[in-house]
Amino acid sequence: MFRWYAINTYSGHENKVKANLEHRIISMNQAPRFRRVVVPTEQVIETKDGQKVQIEKRVYPGYLLVNMDLNDEIWKRVVQNVLLGQ
């Protein structure tokens, strides 16, 4: 059954961990067990030097959201290895 899971990582490394996880999923032929890997962000307008600038800000710094069909094999071979190799 597919469910959403929050995976904790170092703040600022979310995109690197996401890329590593996606690469691992493909290389281990586990794509059918994963639907989405997301770093939740939102567009925010901030004022810098008197000008409004639109930036992308992480909603949950230090977390990835993953929609997957989790089992022990997936956790040990894919997710845990990616997290250890941050």
Language model features with spans:
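Acidic-enriched and Gly/Ser
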Residues: M1-Q86
